Amino acid sequence: MIKWKNNRKVFLTAIAFGTMLNPLNSSMISLALHQIQHEFGLSFTTVSWLISTFYLASAVTQPVSGRIGDHVMSRRTLFLFGLVLVAVSAICAPFAPTFAVLIVIRLLQAIGSSAIYPSGVGLIRDHVKERQASALAVLSIFASAMTALGPTLGGFLMTIGSWPAIFLVNLPFILISFFLGFSLFPKEKKKKLRIGDTVRKLDLPGMLLFTVCIVLLLSFLLSLSDGIQYVQGILCLVSAGAFIWWEHQVDEPFIQIRMFRQEKRLSLVYVQFIILNIFFYCLFFGLPSYFQDELGWRVEMTGLFMLCMSGVSIMVSPLTGKWVDRGDERHPVLASAVLMLAGASAMTFFFIPAPFWGKGLVLALLGLSYGIGNVALQAAMLKASPQQMIGTTSGLFQTCRYLGSILSSAVLGMLFGEEIAGSHFEQLGWTLIMISLVGISVSLYFSSMVRGKQTMKKAAGIK
């Protein structure tokens, strides 16, 4: 047996190189939109579907692929299959004859990369028995780095290989992840199911209703900046009602609705993660526009300055993992929420008149909050999830990220309209203060619930 096959770091590298593909491709595409728009002769609204369809497909596929990994296919097989799909999309994209074909390839990329995360988290849950929070911190570091550096990498690739390069750059990461995963991931017993049992386990009607509900919800949220679309909203509520009704009727539902009542900690983790992503995607999307439109900064300077936030977030992630491993997730989750309020307050009252270095300190404070919250909530999700549903629950966790990001777009659209001026920036600050206050309230409730459960375990003599 080769020594590196038993190496924890190599095992996590195999997973991290795969799970980072989704955030990398969601952020890197932004630099290629202009060139793709002109090459295919499109409007900006049309070409932006490359982003919207990726979000929609990812939001739906994450929990669906998690369900498949929980009940039908081994996590190892699902992880490797996802890598193959992303590889196929990377190879085919440069040869797309029409924009419609490119959209299909982009959907394939989203589906493949979305299958990787829940299966990767499941592999950690099943095979990494010590310091799981630190293991999740590795995934968070890679994901945060790719989200932050994706636009920079995309801009560099555009200068050397035009827009096809942003697809082809996936191949080295895929090859490394596939080789290590194929060699390292333990082979699991095949889940031998009859076709009827497979259909029942998957709950295909439930998956379909969930897909319709999520697509309508995200479409409704994306359209809020142009006014409330009542028909879409009503259809979303109807499909949500039908989905909840159906899930209560079947013996093995796609998503156990009762779980959200029984596992209140998990429900609160999802709520906090949505809040965290609304808050920070408002900054990710809003700050670059403010720096360029109001302050007149160049794109390169804006990108480098945003590293004050994303860089601190990346650096604090491994420390947060160790913090959670040595104690519990309560204190990091609450600390993240308090830092959100501190950062939002500093941005509202001091950011505009602050000198260059002062603005950097405010972004660093905000990055501290995001890095701590990201890792702590992933660890909290893992601890609160039923063992047999870890794939589905981790997939839903990522769906919450997409809900938060799209809700942030709606918030920015309603606040700013066409441009971000100084007065608008203050409105954003007050909005973020209110969001962070909600986050603190939920975090306090979550902390009291975790503390109460720990007290009950101690009273019962359970470690």
Residue ranges of each PLM-predicted region?
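Primarily marks hydrophobic transmembrane alpha-helices of the MFS/SLC 12-helix fold
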Residues: L78-F79, L102, V333
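A membrane-interface helix-boundary motif in multi-pass transporters
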Residues: T159-L171, L222-Q229, M414-S436
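Cytoplasmic helix-loop-helix junction between adjacent transmembrane helices
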Residues: L108-I141
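Helix-breaking motifs and short loop linkers at transmembrane-helix boundaries and internal kinks
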Residues: G41, M73-S74, P94-V101, K129, ...
